[in-house]
Amino acid sequence: MSRGLGDVYKRQEQMFDMLRKNEVDLIFTLDSHIYDSEFIICAEHEEKVHFFASVDNPLLNKENISLKELCTEDFVLTESNMSYRKLLNNELAAQSLEIHPVLEIGNPLQICSLIKNSKMISFLPDFITEDYYNSGEIKHLPVNDCDVSVWTQLLIHKNKWKSPALNAFIDSLIHFSKSPSPPE
């Protein structure tokens, strides 16, 4: 069962409360960029997000597609409470637009699999779609008026004592973090 946005914000705030109370050591987020003087950003990376379609989708014949035009297409999207979907919905609302997906799925890899074999389109971070993109199964759509980015951030409370083990863990996460997304 899908939970509402209120539940998502409540759970997110609970995570930050746990960090403030020293109940958790770190938080790893995938959302809009978080600025808070209580937290230290140990690592962060801006993740590009694109609309994408199968390689034979007729929309790829266009040089530029407006968000308004795109809204008339059939979409498969993640559930509305996912961070990047929430950011897309905010961008749509800012332009007085909305998308009515034909299907909402919680698993983004299932979305990629569906899109590569259909005329539908979707919107996901590049780190999720990069294998499909690099293998030539999907392509990014040239949408000219939607600039949404999500950030992965590793946060720690500013007063948290970092043991050698915690420092080693943070260093490992930074070392093994993903390389930049594929080119557009």
Model regions and ranges:
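A late-sequence structural motif
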Residues: 139-183
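Ligand-binding cleft/hinge of the Venus flytrap
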Residues: 3, 68, 85-98
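Single conserved hydrophobic/aromatic residue that forms the stacking wall/gate
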Residues: 1-9
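Short helix-initiation/N-cap motifs at beta->coil->alpha
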Residues: 10-17, 104-112
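Hydrophobic residues within well-ordered alpha-helices
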Residues: 18-20, 70, 113-119, 154
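A ligand-binding cleft/hinge motif common to bilobed small-molecule-binding domains
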Residues: 28-38, 86, 90, 94, ...
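Short beta-strand-centered segments that line the small-molecule binding cleft or hinge
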Residues: 12-49, 53, 116, 139-141
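Flexible hinge/capping segments at coil-to-helix
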Residues: 38-75, 164-166
